[in-house]
Amino acid sequence: MILGLGIAGLNLCHQLEKAGKSFIVVDNCPTNSASLIAGGIYNPVVFKRKLKSWKADDLIPALIEAYNEMDSQLKITSLNHQFPILKPITTEDDLVEWKQVLNEGRLTPYIDSIEMGAPKGPFKEGFVAHTTIKNGGFLRIEKAILAYRDYLKKNGLFVQQAFDYSSLRITDSGVEYKNLSADRIIFSEGRFISENPFFGWVPFKPTKGQILTVKTDGSLTADRIYNQQFLLFPTEQRDVFKLGATYEWDVLDEIPTKASTEELLAKAEKVLNVKLQVLEEKAAIRPTVVDRRPVIGVHPKYENLFLFNGMGTKGVMIAPYFAKQLVNFIYDNGALDKEANLNRFLRRHYEKD
């Protein structure tokens, strides 16, 4: 049994199906979940430190494989978009650092050249050079989740209801929930982990994020992801883009704010000579962990309770690899990555009954 069908639950289902395992999903289908609102970007490079993103060499092949398989399974040919990520370079000092990175091969195979001058397009002056990141892209995440939800419903594998933790019974042979029974349950409820009486001790540090849907004046090409303290990438509508995202830790609600909208527009308009019309504003809470790593594994007391959560801001990139790892852990006694294993928090945060 899987609780939650966000990006984490989606990938769990996919890996369980590949392994030939049966399952059922329980989800309340919240319209404001972080997964449905997220941009779905994956980027193998951490621009601020000019390093590969954590485990990028493992995560990128895994996500490409998984999402291409979902394309075929759901008969949707536009879920995963491998788009180059355009990164302008604004100062001479920054250019020196990027050239050093290139010469050292620190970001191979994700960058292989630096172009002098501003990139093509409606960019304002002030760029000394630019580079393009390969093997990045984005997933049409809302489209993927909704299509997979429909697939599960048609096959009788989806129960739409709010989960009542008090109705979960742990038995010698597995778990029982109302009229459902299973060998185990995997909790993938995203930010709603705070309501979970079994895993509420895990140190999550949720963040609020806001994203905009904007219409442009037609001067932006829809063949890349624009990145310069913001992310701007195309939707399936002509001249309509997604612009994100903000980070807020104090006010944790799902209400878009004028301040966040203005912040995003200001960042984009500082770089681009383009008129942006806001069509929609959305906000959600991301299930991030204090150390910015996913948290997966088995409950220290109940061997039939598992956690797959904490995908945070990089869920699209992280979830495929670790979903496969968790499935292997459960069924084939595979190992869990130490940096992602739930056990890393036992000593300081878990109190035994």
Regions found by a protein language model. Name each.
Residues 24:
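Conserved beta-strand positions in the Rossmann-like core of class I SAM-dependent methyltransferases
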